[in-house]
Regions:
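Juxtamembrane inter-helical linkers in multi-pass membrane proteins
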Residues: 441-457, 483-500
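Cytosolic juxtamembrane regulatory segments of multi-pass membrane proteins
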Residues: 64-65, 69, 86-127, 455-467, ...
Length: 633
């Protein structure tokens, strides 16, 4: 519907004046609108659902009426309704939202009232900072004890290949002395994270009913684990429940802006996503609980025919596992009401782009997976959404290139008509989230106040616009490289506040600067009438190395924090688990602390390791030396 409205808005802009480019431009424009609409619908649905609830048009589950779209009290739509008033979507410090069915299993102190099936928390790691890993283990074990879940075991599943890191992992495990923590290291990380989890299931799966799967940078509270267990026990047809992990702990300007954006924009998106996905939600690979028996029976992943990058092992396994779980008749739910579930994000633009390169290859593999028989509609939609996200870059670039060769008057008319619907689909979801926050004093306080939240959104939007030319070119190049047969390694992601130097930024970004400058310069020479439109895009592209360097600075991140910018509730009022984890990490980083943690996050975790930016971009951009090791996940 949004796509059709956008096409109708343009009127006669796609008229005969465009000549032979008329229909190709229209097809690309429809694809651009559809891609933006796909991501704009959930937050707008969330806003509408919240407004209806506030006006009394949609009742909460358990109040004598049905939530809008809920088929039963336990459906995920009802779970969204139980989250509270529509302006109360950010969890209060130390509190996690919980559905009525799960709450019945807890006492007034938050402890589990009755013993349920056994659960294991899995922490897969590969060549990570051991101090960071076991600081998280200590924090989560303490939190599980506080929730009365001492019988929940925590398994550190190591694929670490570097001898120094492996030795330190084993030493920290022995020093922990906790009978509820188990450590296992594989000598060969066959299958990466998928193989790591599969080995655990084959070895220990019969001992547990559920597993809470984390990433190496994840953190989750005991209370949230208990609520996940309770809901799984109460709803026997649910195979997976995905929580929403929020980004924490990084201090660079780039990472703090990312953490701010995730905290501000995600709740409204999640409200709408629960409404339209129902029991056909997605799995993101971590911070989720899984019923082990059907996972073992139905979610084993085959090796795709052919060679990498489109063949071989499935890299982005999570969405495929969710699709297989649904195909077998099991439900997959997204539960945005659960708080105290966290992850970390890349500290800078270079590392973020390297991760996108890996994810691009993994999602393009799903073009083959979508053809598998027996997959359900929602499973195929999630696979298609990932593909369309990365296909958007080439579509936008091709549209701009073709528009440059259209007659000048017709091109200017089309640009003027096409820009408003595209801009609306980008801005409206963010504006809706901002309005929700500004309307609530409590929520705006979690972002440093109304003025700080407004300023943060404006600066975040400005950086998004400045980086758009680079991001589109990068995405287009990644897709072209993958389809052209260039595979990428899966290297360990930095878990520290790594800064980017001028040399690294220029070395890794110069192909995009050269390609963009040549294209814009050539069009300006061939079509002087388009120069005024092209120059702003060229200026933003040329500024991208400086943006990559400056946004990676911890000093600027801390300066923004002192000024009240890009604050989140996890800084203003952090949970007990975050405080425990940060204290443990601070102790490990004291000058007399042993091991790689002493370096305070200024480079790769161990000597000889490449940065993630170099390793990830090498797969499709700059030929630099490769690593033999790979990360679990």
């Amino acid at each position: 519907m949004l796509t059709l409205c956008g096409v109708a808005w343009t009127g006669d802009a796609f008229g005969p004046a465009l000549g032979v480019l008329r229909w190709p431009l229209l097809a690309l424009f429809v694809a651009m609108l559809a891609g933006l609409a796909l991501h704009a619908v959930p937050p707008l649905l969330g806003l509408g659902l919240g407004a209806m609830r506030r006006l009394g048009l949609a009742r909460r589950a358990g109040t004598g009426g049905r939530a809008v779209g809920a088929a039963q009290a336990g459906a995920p739509q009802a779970g969204a309704a139980q989250a509270g008033a529509w302006l109360d979507m950010v969890p209060s410090p130390g509190r996690s939202g919980v559905s009525d069915g799960a709450a019945a299993r807890f006492g007034s102190d938050g402890r589990l009232a009755a013993a349920g099936p056994r659960t294991a928390v899995l922490l897969p790691v590969c060549n990570e900072d051991p101090a960071r890993v076991f600081s998280a283990v200590r924090a989560m074990r303490a939190s599980l004890g506080d929730a009365g879940l001492d019988d929940v075991d925590l398994h550190v599943l190591s694929d670490t290949s570097q001898a120094g890191a492996a030795h330190e992992e084993e030493a920290l495990f022995r020093a922990l002395g906790d009978p509820g923590v188990f450590y296992r290291r594989r000598t060969s990380n066959t299958g990466r994270k998928t193989g790591n989890i599969a080995e655990f299931c084959a070895r220990c799966g019969g001992d547990y009913a559920f597993m809470v799967v984390l990433d190496a940078d994840s953190l989750i509270s005991g209370a949230t684990v208990g609520r996940l267990m309770a809901r799984m026990a109460a709803e026997p047809r649910v195979g997976m429940i995905q929580t929403i992990p929020y980004a924490v702990n990084r201090e660079t300007l780039f990472a703090r802006m990312t953490q701010f954006a995730m905290r501000l924009y995600t709740p409204l998106w999640a409200e709408g996503a629960v409404l339209w996905q129902g029991p056909g939600a997605n799995y993101w690979g971590h911070n989720a609980i899984i019923r082990i028996a059907p996972f073992l029976e139905h979610c084993a992943l085959p090796v795709l025919p052919g060679r990498a990058p489109l063949g071989g092992e499935i890299l982005c396994h999570d969405v495929v596992e969710a699709a297989l779980m649904q195909a077998a008749g099991w439900e997959v739910h997204l539960d945005p009401t659960l708080g105290d579930t966290f992850e970390e994000v890349p500290p800078n633009l270079i590392d973020h782009t390297a991760r996108e390169r890996r994810w691009c290859q993994g999602n393009l593999q799903h073009m083959r997976v979508m053809l598998w028989p027996r997959l359900r509609l929602m499973g195929r939609m999630h696979l298609g959404a990932g593909i369309s996200y990365y296909a958007a870059g080439p579509v936008w670039v091709l549209f701009a290139m073709l528009l440059g060769f259209a007659p000048a008057a017709a091109a200017r008319h089309l640009a003027a008509e096409a820009w408003p619907p595209l801009l609306a689909l980008v801005v409206l979801p963010r504006l809706a989230s901002l309005l929700v926050v500004l309307a609530s004093r409590r929520q705006s306080a979690a972002f440093g106040g109304r003025l700080a939240a407004l300023a943060g959104v404006m600066l975040d939007q400005a950086l998004t616009v400045l980086l758009m030319p680079l991001n589109l070119l990068v995405s287009a190049q990644f897709v072209a490289a993958t389809l052209g047969g260039r595979s990428v390694g899966w290297s360990t992601q930095p878990r520290c506040d790594r800064g980017v130097g001028w040399g690294e930024a220029l070395r890794l970004l110069w192909p995009f600067l050269a390609a963009g400058s040549a294209w814009v310069g050539g069009l300006a020479l061939l079509l002087p009438g388009h120069a005024a439109v092209l120059l702003p895009a060229l200026a933003a592209l040329l500024a991208s190395p400086a943006l990559a360097v400056w946004s990676s600075r911890v000093s600027l991140g801390r300066l923004a924090r002192r000024g009240g910018l890009f604050c989140t509730v996890d800084e203003v009022a952090p949970s007990r688990e975050l405080r425990q984890f940060r204290r443990a990490m601070a102790a490990e980083r004291e000058p007399d602390a042993p091991g790689p943690a002493r370096r305070g996050g200024v480079g790769p975790a161990f000597p000889g390791a490449m940065t993630a930016g170099e390793a990830g971009l090498a797969g499709g951009v700059v030929p630099v030396r490769q690593r033999a090791d790979s990360v679990a996940g």
